């Protein structure tokens, strides 16, 4: 059955994308490009965005089928809730930008508040209604030590889900970068899930992998469509949720290492400029720094994928030992 879920997810995305692209073009749902960014990106102006809708629809349909046939499917139900919740936030943000022609989209406060609400509801569904059981201790790899967080774990969940949701969003600035890194990351968590005896989470990870594989050919350079916040916010929220449900939260620092570095580069750039009026990088997130240093877009993407694969394998090894 796992093979069937994978094929369904792959085919739905692969079929939906070429249908959605001309529709988005006709509706003029095109991406705006930052003028201060790399000049090579200006040709991307008008490329259809909100393409994340395709793999989110694929994930939802495939997951519902899995819920019907898989025993102990509560983890999939929770992951589906997070997918829809964070995806909806991203969709509203994209809609305001491309339809209302408001480049800001949702304000930071609006987006942050909505993400907090989704994270808190996730905790309530899992802890209060017992849809799935996970410890409120923060597991520290290698030292066989757990930090009991108790109620403070709610704060950690909010920080983790909101943080990684925005981290993937920041990384989605080069063709295929976030999509490829996400495929690698979900592959690591698929293996980890089965090794930690959490097959339902493993099935969801496999659905994620194949839904994204159906999207990747259209998202590679030169991209025919971007996933938009619709896709990137959902992917980050899902990553954080999987690490929480497996009680392997800190594994995400390595499995999502590139996402972490991209986010830190933005934070360091902002802090440095505010404190010293000097920039550390030529431009942030850091993938733009490498572009402005003379790297081609495809080189940056493949190097970052390679780094993601190496650190992901290390994160997987740590997570199962």
From Swiss-Prot:
One Pfam family from the record: Glycos_transf_4
Membrane topology: Multi-pass membrane protein
Entry annotated with the keyword Magnesium: yes
Cellular component aspect of the GO annotation: plasma membrane
Cofactor(s) named in the record: Mg(2+)
Pathway assigned to this chain's UniProt record: Cell wall biogenesis; peptidoglycan biosynthesis
UniProt keywords, alphabetically: Cell cycle, Cell division, Cell membrane, Cell shape, Cell wall biogenesis/degradation, Magnesium, Membrane, Metal-binding, Peptidoglycan synthesis, Transferase, Transmembrane, Transmembrane helix
Keyword Mitochondrion: no
Catalyses which reaction(s): UDP-N-acetyl-alpha-D-muramoyl-L-alanyl-gamma-D-glutamyl-L-lysyl-D-alanyl-D-alanine + di-trans,octa-cis-undecaprenyl phosphate = Mur2Ac(oyl-L-Ala-gamma-D-Glu-L-Lys-D-Ala-D-Ala)-di-trans,octa-cis-undecaprenyl diphosphate + UMP
Residue spans crossing the bilayer: 1-21, 50-70, 76-96, 112-132, 140-160, 176-196, 200-220, 225-245, 250-270, 300-320
Protein's cellular compartments: Cell membrane
Similarity remark: Belongs to the glycosyltransferase 4 family. MraY subfamily.
Protein name: Phospho-N-acetylmuramoyl-pentapeptide-transferase
Organism of origin: Staphylococcus epidermidis (strain ATCC 12228 / FDA PCI 1200)
